[in-house]
Amino acid sequence: KMTISAPANQFCYHCGLEVPQQGDFSLVIQGIRRAMCCPGCAAVAATIFENGLQSFYKFRSAPSSQIVENSYSEAQGNPYADWDLEEIQSEYVSHTDQGQLSIRLYIGNITCAACTWLIEQHVGKLPGIDRIAINGTTRRGEIIWTPETLSLSQILRAIKQIGYDASPINQH
């Protein structure tokens, strides 16, 4: 039985941790095989490149945090679905005069300006996002969106998809 293993002392292209000897989670990115330490980092790196956001790697000042794999599967449905319930949103979401919704979030794992840029670019491309502003220093952000086009759960899921954890901040 043949086992694929990473060469010794190779480091993850996404998070910078040492790549384990067992398992091969590498990706070919722009014609170069890049080592990844886990399927989570490989998935996030693939998402970043698939969405044309590879400048993130050029401008970041430190490796990204290691990705903790999602504890849910697509078959289990949307893990953020409860955030779409009015009784839960009422504590966290405010309404604008134009009929949009606004939420403030705490976003963990931000380590540099490139993280902020990545989140703003990735989420900002979603249909229905009217405004997104992230402060990398405080790790807080505000998002304004059109609820008929996009749900809060879709926004939270998009943030998680690129490796960040977003926690809504109570508005009251």
Predicted features, each with a name:
Residues 1-172:
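Flexible metal-binding regulatory segments at protein termini and peripheral loops
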